[in-house]
């Protein structure tokens, strides 16, 4: 089982789960509600890494299934939404928190993906075009930059602790 996006009342007032996969579920471990290795977090983040992964040469993680904000494709099986820098880095941060060598390698690849999508002047956009790799929407986005700095710091600290053990 993984987490649901939310519960919403139907016309009779009964709460109905919204099963839309959403990368923001990362917050459940990022804000300390549950550890990164909790089975529900693991199931959710693994689903984020597979089901929200953009299946083009560009790659990256979409915000949620069917994200329509600046959508450039209706092929939701291939492009569940445009890839975002922050959501891809959230997946990296989860791998860092898990801390296995395999997870750290995956995190490094995701960090390199984000850095590789910096535009002129090393500016990071909000989103990436899923087919061309060009910036979409806001650029630069401070949130993308600050998330990159945080994730790199987490990565280096975890890498050092793994070397010490």
Q: Each PLM stretch: what is its role?
A:
Residues 15-39, 81-165:
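C-terminal capping/lid segments that line or modulate ligand- or cofactor-binding pockets
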């Amino acid at each position: 089982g993984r987490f649901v996006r939310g519960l919403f009342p139907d016309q009779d007032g009964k709460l109905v789960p919204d099963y839309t996969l959403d990368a923001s579920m990362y917050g459940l471990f990022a804000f300390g509600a549950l550890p990164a290795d909790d089975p529900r977090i693991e199931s959710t983040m693994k689903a984020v890494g597979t089901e929200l992964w953009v299946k083009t040469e560009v790659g990256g993680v979409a915000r949620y299934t069917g994200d329509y904000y600046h959508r450039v494709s209706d092929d939701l099986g291939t492009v569940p939404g445009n890839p975002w820098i922050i959501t891809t880095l959230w997946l990296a941060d989860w791998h860092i928190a898990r801390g296995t060598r395999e997870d750290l390698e995956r995190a490094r690849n995701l960090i390199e993906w984000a850095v590789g999508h910096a535009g002129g002047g090393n500016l990071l956009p909000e989103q990436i075009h899923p087919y061309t790799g060009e910036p979409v929407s806001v650029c630069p986005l401070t949130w993308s930059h600050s998330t990159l700095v945080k994730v790199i710091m987490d990565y280096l600290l975890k890498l050092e602790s793994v070397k010490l053990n």
